[in-house]
């Protein structure tokens, strides 16, 4: 089967969050038995230099704000084809210092137009799998009735709160027909279109990244027209739980760890926890923390409203009052949050038990996973979440809000701790206190939580099998 994965992120090349990880992991799993090609836009300032040999390169035309030229360069990478599309005559759209900007609907619609033109020139494509609203226009462009043939279209919602509202005039700058454009337009305001809405109507099948989040989406009334769209397509909509690549996230082989360990040590809990402790010592030395503070809780997250930044700040107070260590590693995406957390970071530079790191440093993050006893994920909503899956893999017990994919993967008293209420901090503080107390006073119970998490299947094989089932059902 020829499968194309279209996205604006794919680890390790270009990544801001979990989207890039999922696109890479799913593509790699599918490529074992199928011909998989990943389509990405080229970001001149962000892409690493490629060491892989070029398989193919050709220039082609596409229409967006007039006739434009693009170059598709294909590489072989880990059994997959990676095709990077450079918008030669609109190069400024992606010559940015960050993946996302304020002009994303323009930039990603231009990429979608180029991707559609590229796909239409290929000999045979069975499935085009589109990831999130960024490539929503691609669904409509591949459904145009004048095309001689078109592949089956799968669209995955990675975060329903981001939808791609834009002007209808912008989408009309592509080759999409008036009828196709109507799928994107809002009835209440035809001058406004929504990339997500059109993708829902123009795709053969729609998925999201966990079963619980699928139910959250069906019960979301924040925009009644989007709600009507998803309800009209609910018979071809489901949640498929994300998984992680055990070859990438593996404490037995992770070069960033000071000391490696794995599930084979579950037969010798004292040895396992000694190795976790050695990683903790290495991290404390690196960050200037005092070894007398334990357990170590971490937060590894984008610091945005969805992720519960107010709970992250509350956790600092709880750690101070209860004498345990807390490391927050994350990136802020708005100026006010950046200001608040920078001030906190500066005020805590000499703290013996608290550190805030406001950038993403992959080796450091991996060491944090290996060193931490628990990982806190206080999200207001969470489509799936990958950090709890990675944490469990590294023997780091998840403390989460029971929502979306977190509810699907973390069970209180089985492999982690949970809280529900977000109207105040009482439920959250109770969860933290329960976790710290269990760590300090009930080592046998703590080991059972760690063991359950480390032995949990990564879910990647299951995820790939579910998607293959969807693909096959459409062919």
UniProtKB/Swiss-Prot annotation:
Pfam families registered for this protein in UniProt: Glyco_transf_5, Glycos_transf_1
MF terms from GO for this chain are:
alpha-1,4-glucan glucosyltransferase (ADP-glucose donor) activity; alpha-1,4-glucan glucosyltransferase (UDP-glucose donor) activity
Pathway membership, UniProt? Glycan biosynthesis; glycogen biosynthesis
Enzyme Commission number(s): 2.4.1.21
- Chemical reaction(s) catalysed: [(1->4)-alpha-D-glucosyl](n) + ADP-alpha-D-glucose = [(1->4)-alpha-D-glucosyl](n+1) + ADP + H(+)
Q: What class of enzyme is it?
A: transferase
Q: Which InterPro entries match?
A: Glyco_trans_1, GS/SS, Starch_synth_cat_dom
Give the UniProt family note: Belongs to the glycosyltransferase 1 family. Bacterial/plant glycogen synthase subfamily.
Q: What is this protein called?
A: Glycogen synthase
Native source species: Chlamydia abortus (strain DSM 27085 / S26/3) (Chlamydophila abortus)
